Amino acid sequence: MSNTNNIQEEWTEMVEEMNNAVADSMEQNMKAQAAFVESWADAVEDTIPKEEDLADGMDGYNRAYEEWIDAAEQMVERSTDAAQGEDVDPAEFRDIWLQSANEAFKHVMGTSAFAAANGQLVESMMEMQQEADDLSQDALEQMGFPTRNDVDEVAERLIELERRQHAVEQKLDRVLEHLEE
């Protein structure tokens, strides 16, 4: 009977260890998922425009749309005038569209949404430029060419040597002056 109890205890112990392993695994999985969601939320949070920027952007687009509608109405009016025999200069049509395009772009580009998007674009471009620069420096280093850091270091050393040389020349001049007296 003690053998049966022993087997039962071993079985219970093994099941308990398995349960603990599963619980530990689930806990680690939950922590990993939470870390992923937090990381994802942090990354996405910066890309979502603020509500006031979004509203300002929509307002700008609406004003731009109104400019285009006004231009279309002016075009219809001038086309009707031309059809009725009035002498309409073709440059007038071009001017209507150019003026309305300028006004529409002002409405859109003057919004905080446009400024925010432009800022993100510039930031992304600067990051890409830095990454490309880092890659080119790594490639130069791997090929045995001097990198920007190497050239900067040599330049600093050269400047220091020139400074020291100048100091030695000044001391030598003082010694020579003293000897000539």
From Swiss-Prot:
Usage in biotechnology: PHB and PHBV are desirable bioplastic due to their biodegradability, biocompatibility, and mechanical properties. However, PHBV has better mechanical properties than PHB.
GO biological process: poly(3-hydroxyalkanoate) biosynthetic process; poly-hydroxybutyrate biosynthetic process
Transmembrane stretches, start-end: none
The UniProt record lists the keyword Acyltransferase: yes
Biochemical pathway: Biopolymer metabolism; poly-(R)-3-hydroxybutanoate biosynthesis
Entry superkingdom: Archaea
Keyword list, A-Z: Acyltransferase, PHA biosynthesis, PHB biosynthesis, Transferase
An example Gene Ontology molecular-function term: acyltransferase activity
Pfam families for the chain: PHA_synth_III_E (PF09712)
Description of how the protein assembles with itself and partners: Heterodimer with PhaC.
Protein name in the entry: Poly(3-hydroxyalkanoate) polymerase subunit PhaE
Organism of origin: Haloarcula hispanica (strain ATCC 33960 / DSM 4426 / JCM 8911 / NBRC 102182 / NCIMB 2187 / VKM B-1755)
Lineage, highest ranks first: Archaea, Methanobacteriati, Methanobacteriota, Stenosarchaea group, Halobacteria
Gene: phaE
